[in-house]
From Swiss-Prot:
The protein's name: Centrosomal protein of 44 kDa
Domain of life (superkingdom): Eukaryota
One annotated GO biological process: centriole-centriole cohesion
Localization (cell): Cytoplasm, Cytoskeleton, Microtubule organizing center, Centrosome; Cytoplasm, Cytoskeleton, Microtubule organizing center, Centrosome, Centriole; Cytoplasm, Cytoskeleton, Spindle pole; Midbody
Sequence segments annotated as region (Binds with microtubules and centrioles): 11-195
Amino acid sequence: MATGDLKRSLRNLEQVLRLLNYPEEVDCVGLIKGDPAASLPIISYSFTSYSPYVTELIMESNVELIAKNDLRFIDAVYKLLRDQFNYKPILTKKQFIQCGFAEWKIQIVCDILNCVMKKHKELSSLQKIPSQQRKKISSGKSEPPLGNEKISAEAVGVDISGRFMTSGKKKAVVIRHLYNEDNVDISEDTLSPITDVNEAVDVSDLNATEIKMPEVKVPEIKAEQQDVNVNPEITALQTMLAECQENLKKLTSIEKRLDCLEQKMKGKVMVDENTWTNLLSRVTLLETEMLLSKKNDEFIEFNEVSEDYASCSDMDLLNPHRKSEVERPASIPLSSGYSTASSDSTPRASTVNYCGLNEISEETTIQKMERMKKMFEETAELLKCPNHYL
């Protein structure tokens, strides 16, 4: 950016600030750098302290420029420029808040100051029109005296509020004060005292005549009514915003809880209590069926083995001589008494042992069957009561 353009824009800004009667010092270094802190005080002074007409306009438009941070202040200024001054700045809000764009920022500040001064002139000219009408009304109401009769009357003066001020003089003197409604300094030239002695005014006639003041307070009353109508809407919106913020906080807390639960419940399965009890009961039934089937298979196998063993033992008992004849040539010759005793003793012992095993196995199977019956009865009782926890 050329330094000549910056210097030219700074000179233009100085001229506008002189017209604006800006009382504070200007941070030229900050303006050259494009620091928004150097230009924001000038803008706030132009809107809030320069002209009472402009401040009234801002109050009527329900835009607040006081007690705000830089971002909200820029938002309000841009809205005010768009709605009331029909001006759109070249830079955006973010660009204006950032450092840089020095020449454009100085140009925007100059444009804002020119818009404010122009609006001030327009509003002041509109306020002068009712004051001129008031002058015409007051001049038209002054009537000439009816005759040359000497009337002893007190000196009468009309003050700003329309009341009569009397003094102890004999001759009537009417003093008319021209004033400005917005507390503007009144010059001595505007005061036109009428001291014509020949024009005598009767006090009773002045009391009878009604001085019609223009209705200046009507827009103020309307503005107050609008504020009264708008205030409940604003309060309702504020309450709704507060409720929305609370609900958002609740939603965030609920989301956090859900995330924690998801992390905790990873790899876990949630099952209803009734379904879980049904599953457990079915599992127990299946286990009992498996045990019973195993026991039955073992019992069947045991019976088959015992039958095979019994058949073999019977065959040995029936043919002991054949076995001895077959075994004798291969074996060493022994005494006849010892060999017969040994051959006869083994099958008998085996038959005795086999009978004892059968009795033990029958007793164990009966006991196992009784235990299985008890298990079935217990499972049936458990299935009857569904609220029981296994």
